[in-house]
From Swiss-Prot:
Entry membrane topology: Multi-pass membrane protein
Keywords of the record: Cell inner membrane, Cell membrane, Membrane, NAD, Quinone, Translocase, Transmembrane, Transmembrane helix, Transport, Ubiquinone
UniProt keyword NAD, yes or no: yes
Subunit structure: NDH-1 is composed of 14 different subunits. Subunits NuoA, H, J, K, L, M, N constitute the membrane sector of the complex.
GO cellular component, one term: NADH dehydrogenase complex
Record localization: Cell inner membrane
HAMAP family, sorted: NDH1_NuoK
Gene this chain is encoded by: nuoK1
Enzyme Commission code: 7.1.1.-
Pfam families found in the cross-reference section: Oxidored_q2
Name assigned to this protein: NADH-quinone oxidoreductase subunit K 1
Gene Ontology BP, a term: ATP synthesis coupled electron transport
Amino acid sequence: MNTLTTYLVIAAVLFCLGLLGILQRRNLVGMLISLELMLNGANLNFMAFNRFLAPEPAVGQIIALIVMGLAAAEAAIGLSIIFALFRRMHSINVERAQELRG
């Protein structure tokens, strides 16, 4: 049962759930979590293609580690922006954040 198609379907479901979460949420923290879910779906794709199709076994793992590092940096920067927005506006809703436009 462990075929490439199984992993690709699971990765597509993760990515689509993350995309749906970004489009549906109005809370910035929820949107950040949904973005992390999308990145995990992409990581699962890299690992699945590495497992079943890559001649060099370390390439997909290295790419997945790089994406995980970028996701951690994105989460840290995103949370710091959300904290700064909360200090200024006392809310983390997207509608309130759009009031900052000049």
